[in-house]
Design a protein with these regions (language model features):
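Active-site catalytic microenvironments in core metabolic enzymes, especially phosphate/sugar-handling
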Residues: 331-334, 461
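Accessory alpha-helical DNA-binding modules that contact the DNA backbone or grooves
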Residues: 1-131, 138-165, 169-173, 183-185, ...
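Short acidic-aromatic active-site loops that bind/stabilize oxyanions
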Residues: 94, 266-267
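Charged catalytic cores and adjacent phosphate/nucleic-acid-binding surfaces used
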Residues: 126-208, 213-265, 271-285, 296-326, ...
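Two-metal-ion RNase H-like nuclease active-site motif
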Residues: 117-119, 259-263, 333
Length: 498
């Protein structure tokens, strides 16, 4: 009967209905070499993963190998397969572009000489993801194109009188803004958003460009009498008004991070022992480590039940007795349950120095439900930090809808810190929303959400987007030194009123 239905109608109604019920991202997983329908079914139905990006994130958190039929080798193969697949799509995370940027720059400098090439565009502006790697080249289209002829030439996708767009062998698009008479002009006009450039020219007119300073546009700002605005701040017209009236703040730098807050050890889904993570953090120059393993509701991540918490706290005490000039703090990433409560009793929550409250399950919510859930957690007196505020995964999963100003207002009222989750797939809270948090004197905490020692380096990506929001070290919790952080923890614990 099904064959007859296909022959008569050209489709199978039952199959069509099943496809309609299946998330688009799950169907897309069929494009991944080595993952058959059976394994994809497990990923979707048992792990609750509905997109390729979510799957990659789960692999990097060591969660895939916890399920039957998936081991360490399979997990690594899935990571490599996904990375290859995504590299042949459109947009790339900032961190992905950063990994290949030195090779691209060296390649272009070899072709055109260092003084004739300049980085520009979204990557230079430190945006969280990049569609094209953009450069200004002091040369014409006719001179450039022959230089790209090689045994394996990049594909020329588009040519205009002032630009060339190539697709590199790694899948990344390379945009070259060309011309020998307008290098400085091209560099300035592509190093800010359209809103910023339009506002600048509306106020000050068309700048007079200097070919003597083709790779440095600081002279443009001094020539109109305002303070220099670096490319990472050239997003909105408002920044011009701020630069008119005074110096812009000294934004936070990677060296301003004094402690690692929010990391996972092999007590839950991390790769390294607690002791190894502490030693590595100390060796890297940090003053403290806030170990925040998953809570018991995160069964998929081997979350900690009460007896394991007691054992971990005992180990932390023992390790701290042998550490000098460095301290491990007791923390937990406690799941925010569907009703907004945290998944431990007050008696258990009181044993932690820091409680990070995060949503990890039932992410499909209306704004009303998401707000009720988050604000209930923020109002819990034991919540110290609100973790990854929207639950988004960049280029993979939209965050649940929230009214960010009301969330920030609630954090201000309850003395709750807002995490800037520095994992390059999250970067959540969005940097565009941080300005309001700073206005309300809410502390930001740039945290790596590290599941390995290697993950400590993700702090850098959080710092880069924090710079876009003009966060200073004084406005960031993880910039406190050990003594300041100990005092913060004690003040916060003393303020708890039930």
């Amino acid at each position: 009967s099904k064959i007859i239905e296909i022959l008569e109608t050209g489709e199978l109604k039952a199959l069509k209905e099943l496809i309609e019920k299946t998330p688009v991202g799950v169907i897309e997983m069929l494009n991944l070499k080595g993952l058959g329908p059976k394994k994809i079914s497990t990923i979707w139905k048992e792990m609750g993963i509905e997109s390729i990006g979510e799957l990659l994130y789960a692999c990097r958190e060591n969660r895939l190998k916890l399920y039957k039929g998936f081991g360490e080798k399979t997990q690594q193969n899935v990571i490599e397969t996904i990375e290859f697949y995504l590299n042949n799509q459109g947009s790339h995370l900032y961190a992905q572009v950063e990994a290949v940027e030195p090779q691209i720059t060296a390649y272009l400098q070899k072709l055109f000489s260092p003084q004739n090439i300049a980085l520009t565009g979204n990557y230079k502006r430190q945006l969280e993801y990049v569609d094209e790697h953009e450069n200004v080249v002091n040369s014409s289209n006719e001179m450039i194109k022959p230089k790209f002829l090689s045994a394996q030439p990049p594909e020329l996708l588009e040519e205009t009188p002032g630009s060339l767009l190539y697709k590199l062998l790694n899948g990344l698009k390379l945009r070259l803004y060309t011309g020998t008479a307008n290098f400085s002009k091209n560099l300035f006009e592509t190093s800010g958003s359209k809103e910023f450039i339009d506002a600048f020219t509306a106020i000050y007119g068309k700048p007079e460009f200097s070919d003597a300073e083709i790779t440095d546009d600081k002279y443009l700002f001094s020539s109109v009498g305002i303070n220099y605005i670096p490319p990472f701040l050239r997003e909105t017209a408002k920044i011009i008004d701020k630069a008119k009236v005074g110096n812009l703040p000294n934004v936070i730098q990677p060296t301003d991070i004094k402690g690692i807050i929010h990391c996972h050890s092999n007590w839950s889904d991390g790769s390294n022992t607690l002791e190894d993570m502490a030693n590595a953090a100390k060796e890297q120059g940090f003053e403290y480590l806030v170990i925040s393993d998953h809570s018991k509701s995160a069964f998929y991540a081997q979350g900690l039940f009460e007896e394991k918490i007691s054992a971990q706290h005992k180990l932390i005490d023992e390790l701290n007795n042998n550490l000098t000039g460095f301290k491990i703090f007791k923390s937990i990433e406690s799941d925010i349950l569907y009703d907004g409560s945290l998944d431990y009793s007050n008696a258990v929550l009181a044993t932690f120095d820091i409680v990070i409250a995060s949503v990890h399950s039932i992410l499909k919510m209306t704004e009303e439900k998401a707000m009720q859930r988050l604000i209930a957690a923020i109002e819990n007196p034991y919540t110290t930090i609100l973790g990854h505020m929207t639950g988004r995964l960049l280029l993979s999963r939209k965050g649940y809808p929230v009214n960010h100003k009301k969330i920030i207002d609630a954090c201000a009222a309850n003395n709750v810190v807002i995490e800037l989750n520095a994992h390059p797939s999250r970067l959540d809270i969005d940097w565009r929303q941080i300005e309001y948090a700073l206005e309300k004197n809410v502390l930001i905490s740039i945290n790596p959400d590290a599941h390995s020692i290697e993950g400590f380096k993700d702090i850098r990506y959080g710092v880069l987007v924090a710079q876009k929001a003009m966060v200073t070290k004084e406005q960031n919790l993880s910039s406190m030194n050990l003594q300041q952080f100990e005092e913060f923890v004690q003040r916060r614990k003393n303020s708890i009123r039930l």
